[in-house]
């Protein structure tokens, strides 16, 4: 009988520790010391939430930087979202897959050797909010033309928002860069 009582007590103590106290402690630590990160790293502009630093968005206007292609279309298809819920992930297609090749041709004019790899391929999560500085600099002339500013001004904006990669190329956050474009004075 003593063994059963000890087992029940240990089970209750473990449930309280692991199911209540530990999650409560982690939540409190997150909210006190890492409030921005614990709440999605949301970005506000003009007093409204426009996105997250951590999730890419689908940009199509010529006056904005375009992010990487997304294998999950940044969850922008409402019908798929309703049926499948929010998801992330790569396509898991091989380099010879005809659907992948067709998608790459859609994102890039094939035969153009002036395209960076991140402009043609999706990230592993399919939601990457960053592009390489090289990719951003190659988009700068298009954006400068659309906004009627010099390419060097757009390039300076890119350089000021550059983040250093440890084992990767330098990169920029597309949403933050596009907000900076909108804030740019003529």
Curated annotation (Swiss-Prot):
An example molecular function term from Gene Ontology annotations: ATP binding
Keyword annotations of the record: ATP-binding, Cell membrane, Ion transport, Membrane, Nucleotide-binding, Potassium, Potassium transport, Transmembrane, Transmembrane helix, Transport
Regions that span the bilayer: 10-30
Primary localization class, coarse: membrane
Location relative to the cell: Cell membrane
Matches recorded under Pfam families: KdpC (PF02669)
GO cellular component, one term: plasma membrane
InterPro entries documented for this protein: KdpC (IPR003820)
Its membrane topology: Single-pass membrane protein
Superkingdom of the source species: Bacteria
Family statement: Belongs to the KdpC family.
Record-linked PANTHER family: POTASSIUM-TRANSPORTING ATPASE C CHAIN, POTASSIUM-TRANSPORTING ATPASE KDPC SUBUNIT
Assembly: The system is composed of three essential subunits: KdpA, KdpB and KdpC.
NCBIfam families the UniProt entry points to: kdpC (TIGR00681), PRK13998.1 (NF010602)
Function: Part of the high-affinity ATP-driven potassium transport (or Kdp) system, which catalyzes the hydrolysis of ATP coupled with the electrogenic transport of potassium into the cytoplasm. This subunit acts as a catalytic chaperone that increases the ATP-binding affinity of the ATP-hydrolyzing subunit KdpB by the formation of a transient KdpB/KdpC/ATP ternary complex.
Protein's name in the database: Potassium-transporting ATPase KdpC subunit
Organism phylogeny: Bacteria, Bacillati, Bacillota, Bacilli, Bacillales
Underlying gene: kdpC
């Amino acid at each position: 009988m003593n063994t059963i009582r000890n087992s029940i007590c240990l089970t209750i103590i473990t449930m309280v520790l692991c199911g209540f106290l530990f999650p409560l402690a982690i939540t409190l630590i997150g909210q006190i010391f890492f409030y921005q990160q614990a709440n999605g790293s949301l970005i506000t502009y003009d007093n409204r939430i426009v996105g997250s630093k951590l999730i890419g968005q689908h940009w199509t206007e010529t006056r904005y930087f375009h992010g990487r292609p997304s294998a999950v279309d940044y969850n922008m298809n409402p019908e798929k979202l309703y049926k499948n819920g929010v998801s992330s992930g790569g396509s898991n297609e091989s380099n010879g897959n005809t659907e992948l090749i067709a998608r790459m041709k859609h994102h890039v004019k094939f035969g153009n050797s002036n395209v960076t790899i991140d402009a043609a391929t999706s990230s592993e999560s399919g939601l990457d909010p960053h592009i390489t500085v090289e990719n951003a600099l190659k988009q700068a002339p298009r954006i400068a033309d659309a906004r009627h500013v010099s390419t060097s001004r757009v390039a300076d904006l890119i350089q000021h928002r550059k983040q250093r990669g440890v084992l990767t190329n330098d990169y920029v956050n597309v949403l933050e860069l596009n907000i900076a474009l909108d804030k740019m004075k003529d």
